[in-house]
Amino acid sequence: MASGKKKTSRKPKNRSVKNEKLASFIKDFDSQVKIITEEMKASVVNILKEVDSQYNIEIIKLPMAIREMCWLDYIAKGGSQKALEAAATVKVDMEEITSTVTKTPFKADKKVKKGKCKPDDETVELNPLKSVIRTKTKAKVAAKKPSTARRTRASVGNVANTSKRTSKRGRATPSASKQAETSLLGYTPAATPRIDTSIFKTPALRTPCMQEPVYTFSANGSPLAGMDELFINVPARDGKIIRLLASEVDGLDINRLDQQAFENIKLLSSRLERLCKKLK
């Protein structure tokens, strides 16, 4: 009799190993998917921020009239160029209106004349009663005449009172009158500044005459010492003057000079050339 073959259990073992490998692969795949999705979300947020910043920059580049415009009006006017033209026309109109308003002289309101108010019927009726009462009181006062002694005393008292009042009123000095104005103008300093009138010999600024000796002063007003070295004052824009020394001309930064200074330097060089030719 041939011996029977034993059955082996390899198939179930292989299946369990495959299942474990599949489960580990799925776990790794899920973790990788989560990492990639998080990175994509972060990149989307960064892209949105960049788009927002670029959008704001482009809006800032536009003129103010278009920025204040509604987007419906912007689209209705047909895009950027037409909207710019419309905004420019509106700006020109506004400037014309403001210029006309500023140029128009100010007209003061005419003072209303105060008309005399006519008395009413009630006041007319009350006035005769008042006049009657006044006449009665005057008659009573006239009936009682004061004696001569009382008259003299009253006259002396009135003279004394009037003298006191006139003395108080007559003592008004310029300093007393200025005290009333201090509330409006403010108090003057204790020590009044003294100005030397010999400094201001000319009424206004003037250009120095030909071959006139000129002395330089600082911003504080103190005179500056004379310089042995040769220098040139070159007028520039906004009333500024650039001083160029003979020793510093070679190391001068030309880019800092404006166009007016360039023109003045060229004119000076041409004049100096003529003068040097005459000296030869």
Curated annotation (Swiss-Prot):
Localisation: Nucleus; Chromosome, Centromere; Cytoplasm, Cytoskeleton, Spindle
Top-rank taxon: Eukaryota
Keyword Cytoplasm among UniProt keywords: yes
One cellular-component annotation, GO: chromosome, centromeric region
Stretch list, region Disordered: 140-187
InterPro entries per the UniProt record, alphabetical: Borealin_C, Borealin_N, Cell_div_borealin
Record-level GO BP terms: cell division; mitotic sister chromatid segregation; spindle assembly
Keyword Glycoprotein: no
Basic residues bias: start-end ranges: 140-153
Keywords: Cell cycle, Cell division, Centromere, Chromosome, Chromosome partition, Cytoplasm, Cytoskeleton, Mitosis, Nucleus
One Pfam family per UniProt: Borealin
Chain's role: Component of the chromosomal passenger complex (CPC), a complex that acts as a key regulator of mitosis. The CPC complex has essential functions at the centromere in ensuring correct chromosome alignment and segregation and is required for chromatin-induced microtubule stabilization and spindle assembly. Contributes to CPC function by facilitating loading of the CPC onto chromosomes.
Quaternary structure and interacting proteins, as annotated: Component of the CPC at least composed of survivin/birc5, incenp, cdca8/borealin and/or cdca9/dasra-A, and aurkb/aurora-B. Interacts with incenp (via N-terminus).
UniProt record similarity statement: Belongs to the borealin family.
Miscellaneous section: Was named 'Dasra' in reference to the Hindu mythological deity Dasra, who acts as a harbinger of the dawn.
Protein name per UniProt: Borealin
